[in-house]
Amino acid sequence: MSGNTFGKLFTVTTAGESHGPALVAIVDGCPPGLELDLQDLQRDLDRRKPGTSRHTTQRQEADEVEILSGVFEGKTTGASIGLLIRNTDQKSKDYSAIKDLFRPAHADYTYHHKYGIRDYRGGGRSSARETAMRVAAGAIAKKYLATQGIVIRGYMSQLGPIQIPFKTWDSVEDNAFFCPDPDKVPELEAYMDQLRRDQDSVGAKITVVAEGVMPGLGEPIFDRLDAELAHALMNINAVKGVEIGAGFDCVAQRGTEHRDEMTPLGFLSNQAGGILGGISSGQPIIAHLALKPTSSITTPGRSIDTDGNAADVITKGRHDPCVGIRATPIAEAMMAIVLLDHLLRHRGQNADVSVNTPVLGQL
């Protein structure tokens, strides 16, 4: 299996399966001298880990990360950073009844046809369990970006049919949904409780924002910053769509509304989401991602077995009724990995470039 490494200068390689002994990652390209300890990584892992509320999977994983290499006396050395998270709460017997069946809308069928063999226990390599390593690696990127004045944060902007207007960052970490409107939390909880009673699942929309990004990141033509972000975010399990800035809403906009006019005091809008011509503009970079409802539900669904016979599939085990609830830290991590990669690439080629034009802020 190829495709396990992401990035060009700052790279992340992951390995491991949902019900294997452990997950591992190798992070290459982190600049030396960055102060880094376990808590820097564990903080974001705790935000993503399962079993933290009744609205997520009840699989109990501590997700305690170990740093195996690349850090000495509390600072990165420039060497590869090895990371490990041990799996401790696998219940593989939950999947024995479907080992010869294909769960509809899962990777079972496509993995079977591509590789001729698949780990049916919790989805194996296709499980979102793998994203724990991305969050750990992304925490390293976030730590370095913070030294450059770049802050990356995310929140849930829609759960099923419930639109969630942004009110304040202050409430995002105070609830299980990463909801920026505290008044919406009771409605979200009631919706999820009913969803569980219905033995069903639902999708979600996540918004992730990077502030403090300098102008100039991005490599046209084929490594545009928005294209790389879309690539990274689409690589998150269950993501079916990505928007940058106004996204698909730009179809209904006129040029007079969509263009981000400039004055000596700053930009008058940010419909472009902080990226123009594939290059960061210095405005906040804003991306939205849509996650599908998982098909791992106990309501029977029609499918086939490995011999092509018709079958009804009921997925037992412990699953998230809305995978978007835990997706915010993953989206933050992938944006951080992309931005650090492009920061290092920009530094390598364009570090000596300077212009007299002032950097505009957002009015």
Curated annotation (Swiss-Prot):
One of its GO terms (biological process) is chorismate biosynthetic process. Reduced FMN (FMNH(2)). It holds the Pfam family Chorismate_synt. NCBIfam families: aroC, PRK05382.1. This reaction introduces a second double bond into the aromatic ring system. Homotetramer. This is Chorismate synthase. The lineage of its organism: Bacteria, Pseudomonadati, Pseudomonadota, Gammaproteobacteria, Pseudomonadales.
